[in-house]
Amino acid sequence: MKFENVQNSDKTLLVTGATGRQGGAVIRHMLAKEWKLRALTRDQGSYGAQQLVGRGVELVQGDLEDPGSVERATRGIYGVFSVQDFWAVGARREMQQGKNLADAAKKTGVEHFVYSSVGGAERNSGIDHWESKWEVEKRIRKLGLPATILRPVAFMENYYIDQVEIGILKGKLMDPIRADKKYQTIADDDIGEFAALAFERPEEFIGQELELAGSELTNPETAAQ
C-alpha cells in the first residue's frame, strides 16, 4: 500500500481524551498544523469541551463504552488518536473502550489509527495497567488497521501528583524507585508531537510500534535539576 504525505491536510482527525493530558497535547499540535479536529466527549457542555469549541474543534457526543456512538463519531474521518484512562475506569473497561474504538475505525474505513499504549506493553508483565493496553494492541493488529502504536514511558507530569508535589515543595522527592536506578520519563506534550508527526508522515509511521522516552535519570539527578 502506498501512503502519501498529508502535511497541511484538510482531512479530519478524531481525538479521544481531548480534554485530558495526552489528547489535549495532540489537539494543540494538530491545530498548530491547521488540521480539522473532532473530539469525542460525553458532556458537550463541560468547561473543557467548550474550550475546545472556542479553538475550532468539532464536538461529537459519545461514549467509548457505547459502540454505536463511537461508530458514528468515526464516520467520515481520516484518522483517530486513541487513548483510554486505566486509572479512571480500570482494566476491563479500558480494554473494552479501546477495542470498541478500534472496531469502529475498521468498520468506517479510518486510514490511520494512532494508539497510545504504554512502554513495555509487549513484555508479559502480568500487571493490569500494561496487560489491558496489550490486549487493545492485539485487537488493532487482528483487525489489520493501518496503525501506529506509541508506547510512552512514565509521564514527567506525574511529579505534579498531589502527594509527590507536596513532598517536592518540602524538599523531598518521594518516589519508590531506588536512588541509583535510571528512570525513563516523557512529557505529555512530546507524546502529542510524536502523534502529530505520525499523522503527517504516514508512509514512515504506519505499521510502526515506537517506545517513547524523553529522559533517563536517577531520582537524585532529577531532583538536582
Please annotate each region the language model reported.
Residues 62:
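Cofactor-binding loops of NAD(P)H-dependent oxidoreductases
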